[in-house]
A protein has these predicted regions:
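N-terminal auxiliary interaction/assembly segments of multi-subunit proteins
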Residues: 1-187
Length: 187
């Protein structure tokens, strides 16, 4: 949501971002689902031993770049590898997206999302073994009249400590509230 507001202000057009699904897949299944060429932004999950992926369609990247450089988002192009100039423009957008993601996660855990690199071919990205389970959060990104896909991918081993801490917080919250709720129910 925060990133959507940022894009609205930068692109000066209507932008909406919504979660379409949250899935657990084998890493190999996720990689096979990515078309080539693509825009695969790899980032470090500082505070864990893991690395994550923000994968966006090249059409979305091209649409953002075109709009930022004075064009409109109504043009559609065939997917292609983005140029070094387009990569430089998108890097700032992606770094801002990662900062917004970090803000969104702050209520759950203190994680730092640090941009690492861009890959355009899925075969060159190895953040986990093929048989590792990953969490994939899929988003629908609407820019103007066009809809694009964006995915976040986290290996489960990178989130284990976070999930353990989250479960402990939920349990302690429940145990603190339980006696109070019991009294209310007895009255």
């Amino acid at each position: 949501e925060i990133f959507g507001y940022y894009l609205v202000s930068k692109l000066q057009t209507i932008v909406s971002i919504s979660v379409t699904s949250v899935d657990q897949l084998f890493y190999s299944e996720f990689i096979l689902s990515i078309s080539n060429p693509s825009c695969i932004y790899v980032f470090d999950l500082e505070g864990t031993d893991g690395t994550g992926i923000m994968e966006i369609s090249p059409q979305l990247a091209l649409s953002i770049v075109e709009r930022l450089l004075g064009g409109n988002t109504e043009t559609t192009r065939k997917p292609r590898t983005i140029t070094p100039i387009e990569q430089a423009v998108m890097r700032g957008i992606i770094e801002h997206a990662l900062a917004d993601l970090q803000t969104a996660w702050r209520s759950i855990a203190e994680l730092n999302f640090q941009y690492s690199r861009l890959e355009t071919e899925a075969d060159f990205v190895q953040i986990a073994p093929s048989s590792e389970i990953v969490v994939v959060i899929s988003f629908d990104v609407n820019v103007g009249m066009h809809s694009y896909l964006m995915n976040l991918c986290f290996p489960t081993f990178a989130l284990e400590d976070v999930l353990t801490r989250l479960n402990r917080q939920q349990i302690s919250t429940l145990s603190v509230q339980s006696p109070h709720r019991m009294r209310e129910n007895m009255a």
